Amino acid sequence: MVINFEELHPNERAELERNIFFSTLEQLKGWARSNSLWPMTFGLACCAIEMMGVGSSHYDLDRFGSFFRTSPRQSDVMIVSGTVTKKMAPIVRRLYDQMPEPKWVIAMGSCATAGGPYVNSYAVVKGVDQIVPVDVYIPGCPPNPAALIYGINKLKEKIRYEAKTGKQVTNK
C-alpha cells in the first residue's frame, strides 16, 4: 500500500507520521538482538557471587530481556568473572567457539580484566582478552550487581550502534 502524503488532511498526516516507524532491517535486528541477550555465566571466583545476585529478585536481570543460559549453544553473551588460569584458557576458548554468531564477551572484575591480585602468578592469564575478544570490561574487585547491569546496558548500546552505523567497535 502506497500512501500519498500530499492528499492527506494535515491531522491525518500528523497522525501517520507519529505512529509509523521507518528504519532499516539492520537497525531492527540490532534492536531485537540488544533487547534479548542470553548470557552464559562463566564464574570462576568471587565475582560469580555478585553475578548470581543479578539474577535475584532485588536486581532481576530478566526484566531487561536477559535470561541466563547454561549452554554455550543457547547463549550469545559470555560473562567471564574471576581468575582465568592457563589450564582453564583452552576451555574458555572452546566454549566461546561453541557459541552461535553473533556473540559478545563481558569481562567482569579485575581478575578477568587484567589478572587481578594474582597477575604475577605463573599460572594466571593476564586478562581474558588474550583468549577471546572482549566487548565490555567491568572493573572492580568484585564489581557489584549494579555494575554488571550497567555493563550489560553498555553492551546493548554497542550492539545498537554497530547496527545503526555498520561499524565494528570491537577488537575481533
UniProtKB/Swiss-Prot annotation:
It is a peripheral membrane protein. Binds 1 [4Fe-4S] cluster. [4Fe-4S] cluster binds at C46, C47, C111, C141. GO terms for biological process: aerobic respiration; electron transport coupled proton transport. Its EC number is 7.1.1.-. Keywords: 4Fe-4S, Cell membrane, Iron, Iron-sulfur, Membrane, Metal-binding, NAD, Quinone, Translocase, Transport. It catalyses: a quinone + NADH + 5 H(+)(in) = a quinol + NAD(+) + 4 H(+)(out). It is found in: Cell membrane. SUPFAM superfamilies: HydA/Nqo6-like. Its cofactor is [4Fe-4S] cluster. NDH-1 shuttles electrons from NADH, via FMN and iron-sulfur (Fe-S) centers, to quinones in the respiratory chain. The immediate electron acceptor for the enzyme in this species is believed to be a menaquinone. Couples the redox reaction to proton translocation (for every two electrons transferred, four hydrogen ions are translocated across the cytoplasmic membrane), and thus conserves the redox energy in a proton gradient. NDH-1 is composed of 14 different subunits. Subunits NuoB, C, D, E, F, and G constitute the peripheral sector of the complex. Belongs to the complex I 20 kDa subunit family. This is NADH-quinone oxidoreductase subunit B. It comes from Bacillus cereus (strain ATCC 14579 / DSM 31 / CCUG 7414 / JCM 2152 / NBRC 15305 / NCIMB 9373 / NCTC 2599 / NRRL B-3711). The gene is nuoB.
